[in-house]
Amino acid sequence: MHRGRFATLVIVALAVTMTAPAGALAPQPPAQHADADRACSFPVTEPDASNTAITLDSEPERVVTLNPSAAQTMWELGDRDAVVGVSQFGTYLPTASQRTVVSGGQPSQTNVEAVVGLDPDLVLAPNTVRNTTVTRLRSAGITVFQFRAATSIDGVVEKTATIGRLTGNCAAAAATTAEMRDRVAAIADAVPDTDSARPRVYYHLGDGYTAGPNTFIGAAIEAAGGHNIAADVNTTSSYPQLSEEVIVSQDPDVVVTGVSADRLDATASALVAPSSVVRNTTAYATGNVVAVNTNHINQPAPRIVEPMARMANAFHNTTINTTLDAQPSATTTATSTAPPTDAADGTAPGFGVAAAVCALAGAALVARR
């Protein structure tokens, strides 16, 4: 169905809704779960990060995802066939390489002409896509929903539910978010709730970069029963670069690093470069280097609960199931390292969150979201 026959864009003034602080999931009223079980209804209107109310008159049949987390969510909801375009780092999902790749380069840039050529009914865009890109797409008559940055696990759950509502997958989204909440609750029950029992954790992105406490990655570390050492550093950046001196002085008990799926069982010496300051920490000396799937830890999408469970098991010797049902088999593509940058045009909508840092596996974190 052509977008012009069903999608309208209503621009209104909206108050910016701030995301909840980083942390585990907040309790939800029972009524919300009951509503989530209902079938989707159209038209549907949702406010996005650009202070725009997006209205879809009927269920979109052609969807483009400009970041891999949105693609992962569509796959998780069982609606991969509706996706006609993906970002360059979304091709790890099974059959995703058969879609048109609509971004490229380092840092990743959206090919507006390619997106328009796909004639999508809906484009799902991250907060880090350039505002000028969103404007160009909307000027071409494309319906674009731009997400706020998820800074908590609750934010990731809500993003999943929002994608479900926008794409007509409410029942699947309800099942997925319920499983996410169940997994987070199981982790909370399994790990100690006292600060003294929390190991000090450094999330190693490479070159000193790490995830701050006001990010969904920082929230995942805390929910897994760890204490993020970045919370003890005086910085306002969401993804600060710590000096070697700071990392050594913080002396983490555990180092967490994102790797490709085939390296999850690698040894500490294989995970940490010989020249890395991480080798001067207690974590490395004791072999407490925890590998997690980089596509899952770095993307605010349903699979975030898998590295959370893996971290909890490593931090506290628990035995929590580390996989969701119907896990997609992933392929891994090597990419070159990109330096960290801010939001593409310096004005991430609504919140101004830092947009990109380099991942240890070699891809820009912003593009991998």
Curated annotation (Swiss-Prot):
Disordered as annotated region, ranges: 322-343
Family annotation (InterPro entries): ABC_Transporter_SBP (IPR050902), ABC_transptr_periplasmic_BD (IPR002491), Peripla_PGF_1 (IPR026469), Vit_B12_bind_prot (IPR054828)
Domain of life, source organism: Archaea
UniProt keyword annotations, A-Z: Signal, Transport
Compositionally biased tracts (Low complexity): 328-343
GO biological process: cellular response to iron ion
Domain called Fe/B12 periplasmic-binding: residue spans: 62-319
Signal peptide: 1-24
Keyword Zinc among record annotations: no
Entry-linked NCBIfam families: peripla_PGF_1 (TIGR04281), TroA_like (NF038402)
Subunit structure as annotated in this protein's UniProt entry: The complex is composed of two ATP-binding proteins (BtuD), two transmembrane proteins (BtuC) and a solute-binding protein (BtuF).
Role of this protein: Required for corrinoid utilization. Probably part of the ABC transporter complex BtuCDF involved in cobalamin (vitamin B12) import. Probably binds cobalamin and delivers it to the surface of BtuC.
Protein name: Cobalamin-binding protein
